[in-house]
Curated annotation (Swiss-Prot):
InterPro entries noted in UniProt: ATP_synth_asu-like_sf (IPR023366), ATP_synth_asu_C (IPR000793), ATP_synth_asu_C_sf (IPR038376), ATP_synth_F1_a_nt-bd_dom (IPR033732), ATP_synth_F1_asu (IPR005294), ATPase_a/bsu_AS (IPR020003), ATPase_F1/V1/A1_a/bsu_N (IPR004100), ATPase_F1/V1/A1_a/bsu_N_sf (IPR036121)
Known EC number: 7.1.2.2
Localization per record: Plastid, Chloroplast thylakoid membrane
UniProt name for this protein: ATP synthase subunit alpha, chloroplastic
Organism, as annotated: Ochrosphaera neapolitana
Amino acid sequence: MINIRPDEISNIIRQQIESYDQEVQIDNVGTVLQVGDGIARVYGLEQVMAGELLEFEDKTVGIALNLENDNVGVVLMGPGLDILEGGSVRSTGKIAQIPVGDGFLGRVVDSLARPIDGKGDIDATESRLVESMAPGIITRKSVCEPVQTGITAIDSMIPIGRGQRELIIGDRQTGKTSVAIDTIINQKSEDVICVYVAIGQKASSVASIVTTLEEKGALGYTIVVASNADDPATLQYIAPYTGAALAEYFMYKGKATLIIYDDLSKQASAYRQMSLLLRRPPGREAYPGDVFYLHSRLLERAAKLSDALGGGSMTALPIIETQAGDVSAYIPTNVISITDGQIFLSGDLFNAGIRPAINVGISVSRVGSAAQTKAMKQVAGKLKLELAQFAELEAFSQFASDLDAATQAELARGQRLREMLKQPQNSPIPVEEQVALI
């Protein structure tokens, strides 16, 4: 019979207790109550943050948008076809973030910064939050350097400065995207990093823009963020913030950046769709109450940073599509009030063969004149007034039978000015040539 000594047993138990080292992992897990239309209702996620990433059983990722008493409203960032009612959902403890780095230049990525151009993986150096705070007042500097668009009508009468937000607004098929693409092409010699965000566009349109940029040698300093029309509403909603995060990476490194959101009307529609499905109370035009904040928190991220922070800048050119020229609709008025001016493209001018079809009368740049070059300011000072007077004279001259010599001379000069401001697509003009032309 084996002799069992009690002190040995107690020593063995003590050693095992002392050497016991197991990490306790607490998982915050919930249950799917309901799923459909890109939305899931989840019960049991008690310690979830607003905007936190959640992972479903089929590896689909969602964002927690609605935090209610008894459930969480989640928007899905994928088709979610394999998510079942009663399935489990795990909180990740992370807020949406994307990889960033110099390797993104010349690439086409989706709303989560994953490459979609078939050129292989991208080497990222760090990661940034998709939604980050805009720079404060102290960290900013006044707009003082120009952004040359290469379009004579804009550079002379509606100048844009680095760090400005200038809205491009107009009906469909009036050349809004062309103005933005020309501006990107013109940055070839300016050492400006460009980010083009396509929201809810056809894949063929995005492919054609990428081809144009490649042909003009502009893709090397450009990042294209594409969220196609067939992508879930969540990805269309998040795409502009992803683009802003990529541009911010370069801005905080002291570089000048230019970002184009094409277009924010589609982002607002995607957000409206998500909000209505989440049963948020609808407001004007069925948009939710915080649709102004949707765009203001995005556009406030554009800034000219102070010298202490490296003097980098992010210039934003948001695009808004109007219906039948109605700039007083809800989303257009919201974005007009957030931005530092707008370039209004008119369908009537476009159809009359005046391209770019910029209506100079109601287009304005509130801060850009401080950044305009002295030479341009000198030659283009009275250009806007002369064109306005010409438009008025032209309207009256249709009713007059005989005109005096001074009026005829003014009309002839106005017609010459109008012809001079016409410009073919994808052919920006250097600022020196513009000054000589005027």
